């Protein structure tokens, strides 16, 4: 995991230094993981935290036809989760409609990438 996070950070640095925008999608459950991702590029990094309760996510996972690793995996992820604060992440409640969630994400991202 650590090598993968370090590699993502290095690739992000290369793109940022070349003047390009980067989007990384991963769980980054722990603060230490987010610290590795943002090392030396923190001012350029912004997190979006898609928030839902464990029960909401469990119900959604059970509705998937071809993917569900069971409640144990979800429980372990919630146990490992170190919630980001509003100071270091834009938090979106994903119990809203998909359209509402995607619009909020777009509204947050657009000013960051508009040069």
Question: PLM features: residue spans?
Answer:
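Conserved phosphate-donor/acceptor-positioning beta-strand/loop module used by diverse small-molecule
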Residues: 41-60
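Amphipathic alpha-helical transducer elements in NTP-driven molecular machines
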Residues: 1-9, 51, 71, 75-78, ...
């Amino acid at each position: 995991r650590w090598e993968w996070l370090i590699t993502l950070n290095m690739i992000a640095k290369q793109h940022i230094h070349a003047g390009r925008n980067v989007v990384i999608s991963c769980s980054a459950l722990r603060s230490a993981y987010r610290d590795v991702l943002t090392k030396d590029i923190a001012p350029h990094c912004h997190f979006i935290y898609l928030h839902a309760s464990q029960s909401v996510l469990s119900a959604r996972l059970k509705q998937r036809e071809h993917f569900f690793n069971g409640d144990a995996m979800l429980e372990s992820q919630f146990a490992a989760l170190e919630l980001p604060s509003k100071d270091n992440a834009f938090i979106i409640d994903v119990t809203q409609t998909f359209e509402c969630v995607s619009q909020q994400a777009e509204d947050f991202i657009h000013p960051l990438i508009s040069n």
